[in-house]
Amino acid sequence: MELSEGELSHTSSSSSFVPVDQRQLQDAIQIIDEDKHFNTGILDYINKTSPADVGNNYHIISVFGSQSTGKSTLLNRLFNTNFDVMDESNRQQTTKGIWLAYSPVVSTTSGHTTSKSNILVMDVEGTDGRERGEDQDFERKAALFALSTSEILIINIWETQVGLYQGANMGLLKTVFEVNLSLFGKSKLEKHNEHKVLLLIVIRDHVGVTPVESLAKTFTSDLQNMWGSLSKPAELEHLRFADFFDVSFHALNHKVLQPKEFGEGINKLGDRLVVNNELFKPEYHHDVPIDGWTMYAERCWEQIETNKDLDLPTQQILVAQFKCDEIVEGVFQEFLSKYQHHFKEVDVDVDFAELGELFVDLRSDSLEDYDVSASRYNKAVYEQKRAKLRGLINDKLKEVFDVHAKKLCDTLLETFQKDLVALKGKDFAVNVKALSTKLVEQVVDTLSLMSLHGDISSNEITSGLSKEIDATIAKQQVIELNSIVNKSVKKLSGSLSKSIQFELGDPNDETWDNVLQMFKESYDKFGGDFGLGTSTTQNEQAIERFKFKSWCQFYDVTRKLISKEKLLALLQDRFDDKFRYDENGLPKLYLNEQDLEKTFAVAKQYALQVLPILTLAKLADGSEIVPEYDIFDSKLREEFLGAYDDSDDEDDHCFAEVVTEQEKSEVLAKFKKEVDAKYIETKRSIVQHITQIPYYIYLIILVLGWNEFMAIIRNPLFFSLSIVLGATVYVLYYLNLLKPAMLVAQRTMDEVIIMAKTKLREVLIDDHEVTGRQLNKIAGGKENIELDDM
């Protein structure tokens, strides 16, 4: 929007005490009027009045001070602006609101000097004016706006006001500093935020009796003390006054009594600004282009305007606040008595709909009682205190709300946990989502019944419930994931056992290749997202855990199936297969020692050829099986198995070594003993067979005893006995009991011979010798009896 010359002239008077060329003067624009409305045409004004593109090349200076202290005059004389000044014949408010003007030149000791930067000057309505009286709201907001948007804030003060509290506007500055700290102070916590504001204290009507240094010391001390008494937010307690502000002083003589010295003081201040350039510093600049500054200024005013800390109540409002507070207290106490009556004990089986209606009735009755007594007071205060009472009642009823909400959540959560466990991994993610959604909806619907039409928020409870649900789901997900891992490891272990047992039937050089291939097939199949809704990280960890456990199972299963006892049994079985049976699987009968020794050597070699294959897990290419993980690492075992091994076992474990060398030696020794024993036993049977009666003897006996043989056949009794005896011998032979029967018969015969010899000796020896021996036996027996009695 382009501003016309007429619009600018309407808002700024051309009257001024400044004797400068009127062609250089720039009319001011009112950026905030006395009704607190912000003018959005500032940027158009700046673009119209500045000679070139402003960009970042600008400075903002504002003035603050009491009414009728010559603030506008100071700005006009120093910056050659055209702000309205007071008519000396009629002391009254001149500047209303906040005005902004462009400074074409700055007054210096060398004349009017053009600044290298564009200088924009703000004239702020004076404080303590009779026009506004006790209403200090605009004064505070205007001062805070100037402080927030300016690089240099000129505080215009008479010498006689230095050291005063109200006279020096310390009370107003304290309020402004506190609100500025609460609104904009947190930005100071950001890194590399060195922004400050220069407080330029211009001491007016300085007569020179008190040195400027002494006045500066007094004023600075007052500022420091005031800063120390501010109510600061906790996170800003450590910040100092110097972190936000720099302070500089400049004294001016009396304008009327010492006009020449006054002008010289103005020019010296101009030198400090644009000639010596000692007052403009980079950290004072807002570091935004001019169009950004105008937007920032508008946002600052919006925030300041809506801030309640700058408002002060009137007497009428104070009365309304006191009476309404009194009414609120009385009504609330009456509400508490009803509250104690209804909620003295917590009902376990509560009807949430009825409880919600009771909440509404109790609150409505209390608010109606308040309305009857407080509605005649100031409307704003009445509504504010009504909202306060409503909040107190809501907070008290929320205590009951929270108790029942917790019981409800606990009950439903317990049911949810049972339903979750019952899923047992079937479409887990889908069903879990349905269950959790149903649970939350049920809780929200139930709590809404007693939420006082939404005044009692259930967000905190539902948020906590959601966290509980998530924690429960996460816990069950871990259980289900571990179950999947363990089941998969168990399945792999079973397949691995079958594969190894199959290979043990006929071990060869490719035995471990076949076992490893089967292992890899099951090993590589495990993966995916498992359908549990777990995160990628959890899935990856589960896969890692499965792989580690799988290699542990590989190690354990191989050592379980190929222990030294089972290895010894396997060697013996293989030896027996070659030593005791022929190629057709029939038992072998050795007739000579040469055949025995040859078969023994072959069988022994056949048995021992699998020993190096089974004791070391080695592939056909000669390489040992090496797992992807070091399953003996204690940290990995603790991570994946949850088992911490703090033993001091310093033995080097070898994954491929199924049977250790020591165990291998033990197996070989036992195997040698066993097969040697079988060899000796078999050889003894051959020798016995060789030392038996020759077969031709039986032929001779048959020829010589032919008559007796025929006599037996012709005799029915002898023939029957022969058949029975032959059948008995055949049965014993068939049952492989012939040798034991012969042994029993031989021992029986030996006993019979011994008894016969004894009887024969008794007959042949004299009776007196027999009698003597019997007496000796009796005497010996008696002695034995006596010894036993002793």
UniProtKB/Swiss-Prot annotation:
Coiled coil: none annotated. It is a multi-pass membrane protein. Residues 55-284 form the GB1/RHD3-type G domain. Keywords: Endoplasmic reticulum, GTP-binding, Hydrolase, Membrane, Nucleotide-binding, Transmembrane, Transmembrane helix. HAMAP family: Sey1. Cooperates with the reticulon proteins and tubule-shaping DP1 family proteins to generate and maintain the structure of the tubular endoplasmic reticulum network. Has GTPase activity, which is required for its function in ER organization. This is Protein SEY1. It comes from Candida dubliniensis (strain CD36 / ATCC MYA-646 / CBS 7987 / NCPF 3949 / NRRL Y-17841) (Yeast). The lineage of its organism: Eukaryota, Fungi, Dikarya, Ascomycota, Saccharomycotina. The gene is SEY1.
